[in-house]
Amino acid sequence: FFAKEINFSSTSLSGKIKAAKRILWGTGVKESFKELLKDFQPDIVHLNNIHSYLSPLVARLAHEQGIKVIWTLHDYKLLCPAYNCLCKGEVCEACFFHKENVIRRKCMKDNLLASILAWAEAKNWNKKKLMEWTDTFICPSRFMAEKMQQGGYSSEKLQIIHNFISEEPIKSDVNPSISERENSYAYIGRLSEEKGVESLLKAATQLPYTLYMAGTGPLKNDLV
């Protein structure tokens, strides 16, 4: 049932065309996802990080079959074509209602063509369509829910469910000898601007605890 993999880093013309068609129209996704829905017959489809590889086409296909669509948000892609509401290191909300700003400011990878593609993607999979196809958007924070509402999404479609973890397995696995070691904390994740790792490092210099970091990303060489 899986759609064919697309190499979004391809440097060939044919590869770039395939990537653009997947991003803009979900080319190669429709038949496989329809077969999945037919075979599984779900009551609910829960979406996570579907842009590019799958595209919001899957939300439309599920909605057309009368299936409830729940979409958990992990970034600001529905408000910002470049995902992170940042422009040259500054907070930016210019695309909330005027997506063409992503082209003017070359926000996507600081590249004009990539920014044009991001604009076209946002215009095709627009807010009106996404609200029609999605029953509930799950926001992991009140801040995100407020920004979604500020960007024109109906509050009736937004639910706040914080990211969570069960403490019991952690407590049961704690070794007393380990708990007596030095106080420390860790960051595990992508080393990129939107994650705030530079702010974390600045804060760490003012704390008497050891910070451990694990991950990779565009800021790796700057942080080492």
PLM feature segments, named:
Residues F143, F164:
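Carbohydrate-associated surface elements
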Residues K147-Q150, Y209-V224:
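Short, structured helix-loop element that forms part of the nucleotide-activated donor/catalytic region
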Residues Y53, E167-P169, R190-V197, P218-K220:
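A short, basic/aromatic alpha-helical/loop segment that forms part
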Residues F1-I44, C85:
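A conserved catalytic-core segment of Leloir-type glycosyltransferases
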